[in-house]
Amino acid sequence: MNTQEIINLIANSKKRTIAKAYVSGNLKNIKLENVEFVGNELFGVLFGDLKDIENTINKNDIKNYKIEILAKNSAIPLADIKKYNARIEPGAIIRDMVEIGDGAVIMMGAVINIGAVIGEKTMIDMNTVIGGRAIIGKNCHIGAGSVIAGVIEPPSAKPVMIKDNVMVGANAVILEGVEIGEHSVIAAGAVVIEDIPPYSVVAGVPAKVIKKVDKKTESKTQIIDSLRNLK
């Protein structure tokens, strides 16, 4: 899916105000209108669009209720994380149409937008933002608080591409269209505005290549396989 197709999908999708309602009353013969109900004859929970929930409440013998709004005019649902063979911690937000490889790790507070691709055994650390259509390879570590720019707004034809075995330090920023070569290391706080060759160490604002990856660098940026163990 290219950028324009995603833009069209968001623009033309039916917007939904997703909600749930805790209800009590005479629910034995409750009549449902495009909502899901979980409960018994006296108490239950309704799930669905706010308008459908309100219609169901108004048309049934419901004595008391409490509505919680989960999203307002939402265009794209969250992903069904059951389909991923990965470790996904509580509080991660993953939109629909995101690919996540086997053994990947998505930490608390990470946000992954529509169309992004996360490779096998790659770790997305806490509070990282992965923008729309960003592509991240295998065995990478994207440090806490980093931003990998998306290409939905402003629109860009070329997404960020991070090749295999790349280490991105905390709070780094990689701008739209940038390609990071394999086995490279991006220092914490760096702002990357241009392509980076493989096996490079970059730092600064804007980021510059300061040396090639050597044994000392490799020892300090080692990926720990046991953290990707799903058993």
Swiss-Prot record:
Q: In which pathway does it act?
A: Amino-acid biosynthesis; L-lysine biosynthesis via DAP pathway; LL-2,6-diaminopimelate from (S)-tetrahydrodipicolinate (acetylase route): step 1/3
Q: Give the Enzyme Commission number.
A: 2.3.1.89
> One matching Pfam family, short form?
Hexapep
PROSITE patterns the record matches: HEXAPEP_TRANSFERASES
Keyword Transferase present in the record's keywords: the answer is yes
Organism domain of life: Bacteria
Q: Name one GO biological process term.
A: diaminopimelate biosynthetic process
Q: Which InterPro entries match?
A: DapH, DapH_N, Hexapep, Hexapep_transf_CS, Trans_hexapeptide_repeat, Trimer_LpxA-like_sf
Which keywords accompany this UniProt record? Acyltransferase, Amino-acid biosynthesis, Diaminopimelate biosynthesis, Lysine biosynthesis, Repeat, Transferase
Catalytic reaction list:
(S)-2,3,4,5-tetrahydrodipicolinate + acetyl-CoA + H2O = L-2-acetamido-6-oxoheptanedioate + CoA
Instruction: List GO molecular-function terms, semicolon-separated.
Output: tetrahydrodipicolinate N-acetyltransferase activity
Q: So what does this one do?
A: Catalyzes the transfer of an acetyl group from acetyl-CoA to tetrahydrodipicolinate.
Family label: Belongs to the transferase hexapeptide repeat family. DapH subfamily.
PANTHER family the UniProt entry points to:
2,3,4,5-TETRAHYDROPYRIDINE-2,6-DICARBOXYLATE N-ACETYLTRANSFERASE (PTHR43300:SF10), ACETYLTRANSFERASE (PTHR43300)
Q: What is this protein called?
A: 2,3,4,5-tetrahydropyridine-2,6-dicarboxylate N-acetyltransferase
Q: Which organism is it from?
A: Thermosipho melanesiensis (strain DSM 12029 / CIP 104789 / BI429)
